[in-house]
Amino acid sequence: MDAINLKEKEVFKKEDRGFANLVEEEYLQINQVCLEPSQQVLRHNVNPNVTLTVVYGEGTFHIGDEVTRMGSGKLLRVPFQSPMSIKNELNQRLAFLVMKAPQLNEIQVETKA
């Protein structure tokens, strides 16, 4: 069993987003992103399946043409290849997890011959 202390893994930077890779496996990647007030993750297209959850704080999540403000206690599913940006518009720190997994059809299943 491996317990990861999210507080110990926090990385905050004055000039850019903080980033910590928590899990790096063949079919799963989990990163923690930390934003100071007014910082953001610039718009980009997500290439794997992505699920986001806020650890603490509240962020504004732009996914495609939709915008939602979200705090802790929810999961936000981001469709494959969607444009996404995230902003911390409040006067408090924001920490969230980014969970990435490949498309199911990209996973090759080994069969016994």
Regions found by a protein language model. Give the residues of each.
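Structural motif
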Residues: 58-60, 67, 83, 93
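Short beta-strand His + acidic residue motifs that chelate non-heme Fe in jelly-roll/DSBH
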Residues: 41-43, 61-62, 78, 84-90
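Glycine- and acidic-residue-biased ligand/ion/polar-headgroup-sensing regions
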Residues: 48-59, 64
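Ligand-binding loop in jelly-roll beta-barrel domains
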Residues: 80-105
